[in-house]
Design a protein with these regions (language model features):
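N-terminal secretory targeting modules
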Residues: 20-226, 231-232, 245-248
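Conserved SGNH/GDSL esterase-like catalytic core that processes O-acyl groups on lipids
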Residues: 33, 63-66, 89, 95-104, ...
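A structural motif corresponding to the C-terminal end of an alpha-helix
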Residues: 341-346
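Hydrophobic core
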Residues: 4, 8-14
Length: 346
């Protein structure tokens, strides 16, 4: 079944029918956190972050530490790492997960760290360019909803990393294997990216991490917010809080929103374009429909399709110029057709 509700211009809600577990069990994987992975290419707005990682990892070896909240509690977790855009195959020496400690945002609580492994039990592995890798970890006891996780990814080829989500947590990078260290002794928030001009927003790049799922009861599901900068904020968290305050504990609310994202065309502009993501009609499958346990999707998109062609620094990307020969200024009919495309995909 499909329920559509157009609440305002460029906004709609889609409701998917519940899906049974693949193995027929009473539990299934449900997203507790999600990030839309982008290409932080050298010629994008992200060269500072890339060069910082390269300089800190002189030998290519270093640890990414990522702090993210989980919207669902549980014991057994699955984490998806990506290498869609890296400059080559990535070698990962170790991945650990633990609870955030009380001594700062990047600290991990003593005695909570566990090692994540692939489905065949390997703690070290490679991720081919263009591929993903799932790793699994379990805590001795179930952790409560709203817990903050500290994820450590020790990468022996860190200079090749180009996959980053832009929102939903905080990240640091430090030379060497510090996966078991309680605190960072040489704090390097190298994955922070400040806008190069006014109005583009600041980011905290989250490397390699696309999704964290938890094994949950059959009636638990994920809600996805997907769209542009109008929902890269606290709106998903506010909904999550309101649900929990009203006794709803079997639903997560995760975000697939990207600042500057458009419905019909990939990001415009040489510097900011790669960090505005693929057209929503292109990324909808991966960033919404394939999110584990998804049953409800809120879409807020279309404003940038209208506004970007009017901006002096971007207009040439929409007039079929040499900058982007296939760029065009969308009509109302084309935008409506884009919404219909999303409905058809559902």
């Amino acid at each position: 079944s499909l329920l559509l509700c157009f609440a305002m211009l460029c906004s709609m809600a889609l409701s998917l029918a519940p899906q049974a577990s693949a193995d027929g069990s009473s539990e299934h994987w449900v997203a507790a956190w999600h990030g839309s992975v982008l290409n932080a290419a050298e010629d994008s707005q992200a060269p500072k972050a890339i060069s910082s990682i390269s300089s800190l990892a002189a030998s290519g070896r270093g640890t990414f530490r990522i702090q993210v909240p989980t919207q669902l509690g549980g014991k057994d977790f699955r984490m998806t790492l990506t290498n869609y855009y890296g400059t080559g195959s990535l070698s990962v020496g170790k991945v650990t997960a633990g609870l955030q400690g009380s001594e700062g945002l990047s600290g991990q609580a003593s005695g909570t760290t566990v090692t994540a492994k692939t489905s065949n039990g390997k703690s070290s592995f490679s991720i081919a360019k263009g591929a993903t890798q799932d790793v699994f970890f379990s805590f001795p006891n179930a952790i409560p909803e709203g817990s903050s996780l500290i994820i450590n990814i020790y990468c022996t080829s860190a200079k090749k990393v180009r996959d980053f989500a832009l929102t939903g947590g905080s990240a640091w990078f430090q030379y060497g294997d510090i996966t078991s260290d309680k605190n960072l002794n040489a704090l390097g928030n190298a994955a922070n990216l400040v806008s190069i001009n006014n109005g583009e927003g600041d980011y905290n790049l989250l490397p390699l991490l696309q999704e964290i799922d938890v094994k949950a009861s059959a009636d638990t599901y994920a809600t996805v917010f997907i769209g542009d900068s109008t929902i890269t904020n606290s709106i998903p968290n506010i909904l999550q809080d309101n649900l929990q305050k009203n006794g709803v504990h079997n639903a997560s609310v995760v975000s697939s929103a990207i600042k500057g994202n458009e419905l019909l065309q990939d990001g415009a502009g040489k510097l900011q374009g790669p960090l505005e993501g693929a057209a929503l009609t292109t990324r909808f499958q991966m960033d919404a429909l394939e999110v584990a346990g998804v049953q409800k999707i809120f879409v807020k998109i279309g404003a940038n399709d209208i506004l970007h062609p009017l901006l002096p620094d971007l207009k040439e990307w929409f007039d079929g110029s040499n900058t982007r020969p296939d760029g065009y200024v969308p009509t109302a009919e084309q935008i409506i057709g884009g919404y219909q495309n999303l409905i058809d995909q559902v």
